[in-house]
């Protein structure tokens, strides 16, 4: 019987339970950060339990980290959460990449970077964008606080198996369009809830030609499509990325042979299929207050269809028939678990090289990990950003969410490489416009969005 990639991995991990009901599945990797872990560790203490597999658990600090001065944590709650993670990981013998550590960074960046993220695994974390790790051909999803405690105690989790959806991506990406534009285009076309109840697999020649960094960007935003899980079949690109990393399997050839068994046998095995052609795709920009409210950079903003649109326009300070190029910007943010990897920074730096920020723009560039930061400094990329007038920061989640000092002021427009543009997401009253690293970098130079596919940029 032919099966999907998701089905094959799921079946390998089921311990007990019937299809259609909650099943107990084994967890291969549990990633932990400072925000969603304090209560679970307290729960373990209250029942005198230990962490079942500390060797399959890894913790880092990211959400609360002040990226301008990582050791100067002013917020009392942030400091408490960070100190508590140090205490808990020490008590329960869990590896921790604390602030200042060479391995520290955003959890969904350092997991793959260290080689912890591998094909055919079940990976969980108390964070919705855990779907990022599915780019390696893994089942990866975010879990709630009580589930974090359950995984710590048992290395298992109860889950109802979702249906499967295949999204076939076809065509050749035009110049200066990227994976961020693909996933934003898919969400703009199909909406923010089409993936509810499904595990999404991205496939097709376009996906096969993407780098691992680009695949991670697409899987990262599966959650913005309503799914908890996005994934890509493992292939030679996957294997090349993992090989030689710190936590890569010692017998790599055997591991690669095992991973190669995991693929979708036939398109007809999916419960649902969609297609998306990128041949004429333009860079995407969000204009509203959810990721589905996005438009190609060269098109006018849409007419108001309902109260949601009207409210979004009022909040964001725009109106129909404007174009993204008419949006004047106050801030740009290059970072987050969506687009803070070396490749993302390199793309943005190439766009900024030899230019300077517009006078009205403040720019924060936040690498996803200490390793990426060090590499960017060594290669000269960091210098390009600094010469352009950007603030070159320490690794952390930063302005993706208003949980640390990196907040966008009320009423200000920010072009952001992050994944969510909800009301107040980047600071109370902030106005977020999502786009690719290349688009955000170019917007910082111009002071507004520009079409980077035109002759001037191509």
Curated annotation (Swiss-Prot):
InterPro entries in UniProt: 3-IsopropMal_deHydase_lsu, Acnase/IPM_dHydase_lsu_aba_1/3, Acoase/IPM_deHydtase_lsu_aba, Aconitase_4Fe-4S_BS, Aconitase_4Fe-4S_dom, IPM_dehydratase_rel_enz, IPMI_cat
Keywords noted in UniProt: 4Fe-4S, Amino-acid biosynthesis, Branched-chain amino acid biosynthesis, Iron, Iron-sulfur, Leucine biosynthesis, Lyase, Metal-binding
SUPFAM superfamilies named in the record: Aconitase iron-sulfur domain
GO biological process: L-leucine biosynthetic process
Top-rank taxon, per record: Bacteria
One Pfam family it belongs to: Aconitase
Gene3D superfamilies: Aconitase, domain 3 (3.30.499.10)
Cofactor mode of binding and number, as noted: Binds 1 [4Fe-4S] cluster per subunit.
Recorded metabolic or biological pathway in which this protein acts: Amino-acid biosynthesis; L-leucine biosynthesis; L-leucine from 3-methyl-2-oxobutanoate: step 2/4
Catalytic activity as recorded in UniProt: (2R,3S)-3-isopropylmalate = (2S)-2-isopropylmalate
Positions contributing to [4Fe-4S] cluster binding: 337, 397, 400
Protein function: Catalyzes the isomerization between 2-isopropylmalate and 3-isopropylmalate, via the formation of 2-isopropylmaleate.
Annotated family: Belongs to the aconitase/IPM isomerase family. LeuC type 1 subfamily.
Subunit structure: Heterodimer of LeuC and LeuD.
Name of the protein described by the UniProt record: 3-isopropylmalate dehydratase large subunit
Organism: Leuconostoc mesenteroides subsp. mesenteroides (strain ATCC 8293 / DSM 20343 / BCRC 11652 / CCM 1803 / JCM 6124 / NCDO 523 / NBRC 100496 / NCIMB 8023 / NCTC 12954 / NRRL B-1118 / 37Y)
Gene responsible for this protein: leuC
């Amino acid at each position: 019987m032919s099966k999907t990639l998701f089905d094959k991995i799921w079946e390998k991990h089921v311990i007990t339970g019937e299809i259609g009901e909650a099943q107990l599945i084994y967890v291969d990797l549990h990633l932990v950060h400072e925000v969603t872990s304090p209560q679970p560790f307290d729960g373990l203490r209250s029942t005198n339990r230990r962490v079942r597999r500390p060797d399959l658990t890894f913790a880092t600090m990211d959400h609360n980290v002040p990226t301008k001065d990582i050791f100067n944590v002013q917020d009392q709650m942030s400091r408490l959460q960070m100190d508590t993670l140090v205490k808990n990981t020490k008590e329960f013998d869990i590896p921790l990449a604390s602030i200042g550590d060479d391995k520290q960074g955003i959890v969904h960046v350092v997991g793959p970077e260290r080689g912890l993220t591998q094909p055919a695994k079940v990976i969980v974390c108390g964070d919705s964008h855990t779907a990022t790790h599915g780019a390696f051909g893994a089942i990866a999803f975010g879990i709630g606080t009580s589930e974090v405690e359950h995984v710590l105690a048992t290395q298992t989790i109860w889950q109802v198996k979702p249906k499967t959806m295949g999204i076939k991506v076809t065509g050749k990406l035009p110049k200066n369009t990227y994976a961020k534009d693909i996933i934003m285009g898919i969400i703009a076309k199909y909406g923010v809830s089409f993936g509810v109840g499904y595990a999404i697999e991205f496939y097709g020649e376009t996906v096969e030609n993407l780098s691992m960094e680009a695949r991670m960007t697409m899987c990262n935003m599966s959650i913005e499509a309503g799914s908890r899980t996005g994934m890509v079949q493992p292939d030679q690109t996957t294997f090349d990325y993992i090989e030689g990393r710190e936590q890569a399997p010692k017998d790599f050839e055997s591991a690669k042979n095992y991973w190669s068994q995991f693929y979708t046998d036939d398109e007809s095995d999916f419960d649902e299929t969609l297609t998306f052609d990128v041949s004429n795709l333009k860079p995407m920009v969000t204009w509203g207050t959810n990721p589905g409210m996005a438009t190609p950079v060269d098109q006018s903003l849409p007419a108001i269809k309902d109260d949601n649109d009207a409210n979004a326009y009022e909040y964001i300070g725009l109106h129909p028939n404007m174009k993204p190029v008419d949006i004047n910007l106050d801030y740009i943010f290059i970072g987050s678990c969506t687009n803070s990897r070396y490749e993302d920074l390199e793309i943005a730096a190439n766009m900024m090289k030899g230019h300077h920020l517009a006078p009205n723009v403040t720019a924060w560039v936040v690498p996803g990990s200490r390793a990426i930061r060090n590499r960017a400094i060594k290669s000269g990329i960091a210098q390009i950003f600094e010469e352009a007038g950007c603030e070159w920061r320490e690794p952390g989640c930063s302005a993706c969410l208003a949980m640390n000092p990196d907040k966008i002021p009320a009423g200000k427009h920010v072009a952001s490489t992050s994944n969510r543009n909800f009301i107040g997401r980047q600071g109370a009253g902030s106005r977020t416009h999502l786009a690719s690293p290349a688009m955000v970098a170019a917007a910082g130079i111009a002071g507004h969005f520009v079409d980077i596919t035109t002759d001037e940029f191509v």
